[in-house]
Amino acid sequence: METSESSTSDYRQTEGEGEGVPGTLSTAVCEHLRKLCLREFPCGIGSWNKSRFLPQKCRVWRELVPKEEETLVPEEETVEALLGLVRSNHSPWAMLKDASAEDRFLRELAIQNPLMIKDTFFYSYFRSLRVVNKGVSLVDKDLLKFLKLEELVLSANKIEEIDANNLPPTLKVLELYGNLIASMECLCSAPPPRLQHLGLGHNKLLGPLESLYVTSHNWPQLVSLDLGFNNLTDLQNMILGLSTLRHLRLLVLQGNPLSLVPYYRGFTIDSLAHLCVLDDITVSPNEKHQFRGLNIHGDLLAREAQFVVTIGNVRGVLDSSILDPEPGPDGPFISYSYYVTYDFVEDEDMERNVSGLVEATHHDSVLDEIDKHFSGTDEEDQQEDPLDGRHRHRGRQRFHPGSTEEMSKELSEFIAKEMSQMAEGSVESGITEVDWSETSISIHSAPLPQSIDSSEELAKLRPKIDIQLCPSPGTVLFNTVHKPWSDVIPCTYEMKHTLKELIRVKAFLLAGTTVSIVEEKILSWPVVPTPVESPLPAKKGKDNNKKKEPAKDKVHKKKKEPPRELRQDPPVLTVLGSGLVYLEPLLAGEAVVSTVCNFGVVRTLETDRLTHARDSKKVKKSLKKDRSKTVPPTMESGYQPEPLSVEVQIQLHQYRSVEEAFLSLID
């Protein structure tokens, strides 16, 4: 009976005394029966069918009544006409579209034989009771009145605990999907002995003790068990309890943190030999063969999840340099670089064991660190920097939940500390230089003041960071290597994340990750030499030596002028596009989430024309390459700019055989 209710007498009593106890199962059943209107037209007994249910004596007396009075009695409806009123979709008494077959049966029965609608009929006839999304929080003892009840569905309610003593012993199916149950202990005080299916998916089951309640001692006849989308983390102990269920054939554990470990499916299949279906996927003989023997060494397998994040090409980026004026001799010299950021969950053990959190599987993979922009180095300098490891460790910042002001304050304090350290380092190493060439300027680390006392001076050194670059609470921001502009920017980024806090990983997958394309703009200015930097005596000595040199050497010396010194402004970071990548499919059993994040069109016909015009003026040696490039069409009607996009793939690592699992133990 779909969301059916108590008996008719219960309905009358509730109608007279007011509503029943709110939140109880019996109240929800009674309320649903009231909405079926089983005692109102065209159901029940009334002037529309009273003569069919009058006692025999009354009918004999009625035959003696004069015909004149007979005309005062309203005309009664036939059973077929009354049934037509509840069956027709155009009738005001028609059933709702979502009405169940049992609801339709009840209404038709109330027309054909309304005298059967009694307590004894409800409690002895119905074998199925479905109360879905009715706000039920308590299963009361009135449920025991259903003597033949075999199926009880209480999905999408507010049940936190069930008194198993109130469950009929005849139950074979108990579905509690989408409630608030935190432990199975309440069901094990007096579990229905004939139960064959138990559904506890999308509840709040948590803790290692739950494995003690899924044994054959409590559920000797259990064939199907759904524990999906809870917070169970201990796979080994859970499988140990499930292995006692000899009749278990269907099992759902996906959506739990324990299903994120690489050996989840193989270990479960090898441990439960009689299992036929796992997470709605049939267990094949080939799978059983591939994972044979894995359960023997289950305790040695690490309880951690492994993800591989791959970022491919970035397309549709606007080249901002075409909008800047040509630099004069006094600057500013403007450089642009582009990279992609994403946030990923932070492990609690990360600070103590950084290598256990992230393992770079590509030589260009670097950890995103907001303070790293102070270095002002290009890609080659980043690879050659001996302090690169220190920067990467420092970039792992912890962001706790809080207001935006608190986050900004913490970020400012962190940047101030880093600036002080870098200022000391720059004093020891001296002022760095800039390498000039015909086509590019390679800018090294800019000099910093020896001391930072005033807050105003410190504020000038801080980078202008877009608020969108701050990671979500509990996550860390990662980024690809900075790349110069091109029509297609290849990131070639791959990072492996190994995480032990599985509950935090599940929460992160439900929330998703934010992927952003960032533009970094740096302004550089020539450094005016001071008298201390260029002493006169040294120059005179050099001039005397130069007089002795031939004229050809002078020309050669002029070409080898020392590189100019530049100072850099704090980098300006701009988020060109940002969007959320949904990772819930990884929790629901998918192995890979692959998508192209589309942030819309940022380029125009005019900007593409400027870019092409600039590229056509480059060195003649690259003329062939320029000809092969795609030229933007001159007609606006045929112009279709490419949207700003980035290719992202996140893979949940899963073992495909027992050999692969054992190799992980060696590594």
From Swiss-Prot:
Residues 256-294 form the LRRCT domain. Residues 390-399, 617-627 have a biased composition (Basic residues). InterPro entries: Cilia_flagella_integrity, LRR_dom_sf. The keyword Repeat applies. The keyword Repeat applies. Residues 377-386 have a biased composition (Acidic residues). Keywords: Leucine-rich repeat, Repeat. Residues 1-24, 374-407, 533-570, 616-640 are annotated as: Disordered. LRR repeats lie at residues 148-169, 170-191, 194-213, 221-242. Residues 540-553 have a biased composition (Basic and acidic residues). Residues 1-11 have a biased composition (Polar residues). PANTHER family: LEUCINE-RICH REPEAT-CONTAINING PROTEIN 43 (PTHR45973:SF35), PROTEIN PHOSPHATASE 1 REGULATORY SUBUNIT SDS22-RELATED (PTHR45973). This is Leucine-rich repeat-containing protein 43. It comes from Mus musculus. The gene is Lrrc43.
